[in-house]
Amino acid sequence: MNIHEYQAKALLGEFGVPISKGVPVLKAADAEAAAKALPGPVYVVKSQIHAGGRGKGKFKEASAGDKGGVRIAKSAAEVSEFAKQMLGATLVTIQTGPAGKQVNRLYIEDGSDIDKEFYLSLLVDRETSRVSFVVSTEGGVNIEDVAHNTPEKIVTFSVDPATGIMGHHGRTVANALKLSGDLAKQAEKLTAQLYAAFVAKDMSMLEINPLVVTKQGQLRVLDAKVSFDDNALFRHPEVLALRDETEEDAKEIEASKYDLNYVTLDGNIGCMVNGAGLAMATMDIIKLYGMAPANFLDVGGSASKEKVAAAFKIITADPNVKGILVNIFGGIMKCDVIAEGVTAAVREVGLSVPLVVRLEGTNVELGKKIILESGLNVVPADNLDDAAQKIVKAVKGG
């Protein structure tokens, strides 16, 4: 689960992390008062969407002006003017895709006099089963570009969960950022604070880009992006309360109600598969034959007829879907359950696109019989390669 920047900063502030003063705004009419509540005289008006690249992004609407999603204002009146332009407008960034995202919230933040910019993040390293730090002197830019062009400017290290954060970890961060004296002490303190927040709130990723040194000699978190482990949300109701469903795909929200692993993609072939590995292989072979998947959907190994039917409805609700491929290898998952779920869903919502079904494994003959006797227009497939070729051909009208 992701949260907005202003929510992330408020959470980090509870752990003593140095952040600038700011006020979230939902209505343009409140923007000027929000600015006047801050020290000023310079303010930053930040679009709050779940996507990066806001500063370099562009709004679709001409009425929003030609500036990006993060704007510098020199007065409270200018803050108000920016708010009127930005709220309700559609911001397109490198991470939103061409459709963009509507800006429904702004964060009015006190301006900072910046001397240096750094990059600092924490994430769960699945290879070491530890929390890892990624640190770089190159802040305010895409860390992927830094990793590609100047990897020597990135320092990484992990923290042993048995010992937790220790003094030498903070010194490693300070050294990586080439900080000394009081700034080094601030970096050591910040390292401990961030680790404490990360572990206490079951985060999966915490990215600060940039972490800045102000001209007054203070470290400050200028931007923060936080993701949480969905499997741990049950013990963090205060975090779950921060969820903004308007920032999420409606189909993904619906899928989560049935414990389905669903991710919207930008292709035209809907996929229903059991098992993440088989799902990825299915998407790969669709690409191999010249088309792209419309989604990743893993129904899991213990899906019921109702769960399968719900999954099928979610796929058909996507207007971009021009064909559907069901690819099931029944181990724990039984092929007859898949067949019953698919046929029930088709009877309820109808079927206006080609459907190719490949079943193999437990109760496969019974599953094929259910589909055959349903009278539905389903194209059977013998194996994955055959299934991929058939759905691509059907969608292309071959």
UniProtKB/Swiss-Prot annotation:
* UniProt: ATP binding residues: 46, 53-55, 109, 112, 117
Entry EC number(s): 6.2.1.5
Query: Which cofactors are required for activity?
Result: Mg(2+)
Top-tier EC class: ligase
Tell me the cofactor note: Binds 1 Mg(2+) ion per subunit.
Disulfide bond entries: none
What are its GO biological-process terms? succinyl-CoA metabolic process; tricarboxylic acid cycle
> What does the annotation say about its assembly with partners?
Heterotetramer of two alpha and two beta subunits.
Q: Which family does it belong to?
A: Belongs to the succinate/malate CoA ligase beta subunit family.
The entry's protein name is Succinate--CoA ligase [ADP-forming] subunit beta
Species of the source = Bradyrhizobium diazoefficiens (strain JCM 10833 / BCRC 13528 / IAM 13628 / NBRC 14792 / USDA 110)
Taxonomic lineage: Bacteria, Pseudomonadati, Pseudomonadota, Alphaproteobacteria, Hyphomicrobiales
